[in-house]
Structures are given as C-alpha cells and as structure tokens.
C-alpha cells in the first residue's frame, strides 16, 4: 500500500555545475559516477538526481540532506541504497530539457 507520493521536475538548464551544488546534491558514490561523464551528461545526471531526491524528501516525515541519499542503478532501475529508505520506490525520467523524479513510499504494514 502506498503511504505517500513525491514528484519533482526540473529544467536541465537551471542546474549549475558548481562544486558547492554538486556536493550538496550527490552522495560520495554518485560523485564518482558523475566525474566520468561529459559536460552534457553531467548536467542531465545532476538534474535527475535533484528531481528524484526532491521527490524522495517530499515523502518523508523527517528532513534529510540530499547528499545523504545514495542512488544507484541495478538492472537498469534506480534504487535507493540507504537501508532506512528501502520502503520507497523511485523512478527517474529524462527528456531533452527536463528531468522528472517520482517516489512512492510504501506502508510498513506493522
């Protein structure tokens, strides 16, 4: 059962490739992936992470820093690596100008 939904969309050109913004949004693992991309890919990657992390935060009862949320792809699907956020399903989508993220928080059923 879905407990909460978060969604966010961002225009890629609004994303700035500045170090202080990058470390605010990306986890240490994500920064490694980010660093091997070209400039266009970096902007799209960062926009996607911004959108999905905003969506995740919207589902939570307590605030969390974006860079504490660690996302990676497993079998071509985005997955939250944080144990405490395992009950949140996510999807990231990219279009020429935009990135969108949606997060579905599932009930614990306890």
Swiss-Prot record:
GO terms for biological process: fatty acid biosynthetic process. InterPro entries: 4-PPantetheinyl_Trfase_dom, 4-PPantetheinyl_Trfase_dom_sf, ACPS, Ppantetheine-prot_Trfase_dom. It is found in: Cytoplasm. Its main location: cytoplasm. GO terms for cellular component: cytoplasm. Transmembrane segments: none annotated. The keyword Metal-binding applies. Coiled coil: none annotated. Keywords: Cytoplasm, Fatty acid biosynthesis, Fatty acid metabolism, Lipid biosynthesis, Lipid metabolism, Magnesium, Metal-binding, Transferase. Mg(2+) binds at residues 8, 54. It catalyses: apo-[ACP] + CoA = holo-[ACP] + adenosine 3',5'-bisphosphate + H(+). Its cofactor is Mg(2+). This is Holo-[acyl-carrier-protein] synthase. It comes from Mycoplasma capricolum subsp. capricolum (strain California kid / ATCC 27343 / NCTC 10154).
């Amino acid at each position: 059962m879905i407990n909460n939904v978060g969604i966010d969309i961002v225009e890629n050109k609004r994303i700035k490739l500045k170090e202080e913004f990058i470390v605010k949004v990306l986890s240490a693992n994500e920064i490694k992936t980010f660093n091997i991309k070209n400039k266009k890919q970096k902007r799209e990657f960062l926009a996607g992470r911004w959108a999905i992390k905003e969506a995740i935060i919207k589902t939570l009862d307590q605030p969390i820093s974006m860079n504490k949320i660690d996302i990676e792809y497993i079998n071509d699907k985005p997955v939250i690596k944080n144990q405490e956020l395992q009950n949140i399903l996510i999807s990231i989508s990219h279009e020429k100008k935009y990135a969108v993220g949606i997060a579905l928080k599932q009930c614990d059923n306890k």
